[in-house]
Amino acid sequence: MKLIVGLGNPGPEYAFTPHNAGFLAIDRIALICDVQVANRRGRALTARTRLAGHDVLLAKPETFMNLSGLSVAALLNELELGVTDLIVLYDELAIPLGTIRVRERGSAAGHNGVKSISGVLGTEDWTRIRIGIGKAPTETGGIVKSGGKDFLLSPMRKQAMKELDESLDQAVRAVEAVLTKGVGAAMNEFNRKVEPES
């Protein structure tokens, strides 16, 4: 059994915001597996299914982003799993929209959901799939803003959603690669730099 967690904020007002890319990725996996992420368990909405020949529990924490670690720890404990059984999908400002990166471990790099998980689990050694949302139009004093609104929590425009859609497909393939080939092989496959077209 593997625990696959997407990070985001609960509530319809956050549904299609950049910060909810992790939730959207879980929804995409659920769609492919023909399940609904609706069972409440471990402070999250969950669905048990099979993906790439593996038993998995899909989860979307209901704790809000900054407390995601509480939900992840509760689920790992309930399922009697370790951090090696965890895959987390989340948004990443430092990665261009339409791309993803797979990592075996790493720092939070300012992401409060990741910081919460690492803090509660006491380690940064867990697999993550970072979904690129691109840089915000303006960054000042650590607050990411776009036209006076918080970029991360503002609904995405149609073109941005189209590009994010490509990232979500890649994220699903990356999860399948981690499950079937391992993290190293998934990193080799998905972390290659794309050469610009001439």
Regions from the PLM with identified roles:
Residues M1-A108, V114-R130, K135-D150, S154, ...:
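Nucleotide and nucleotide-moiety/phosphate-recognizing core
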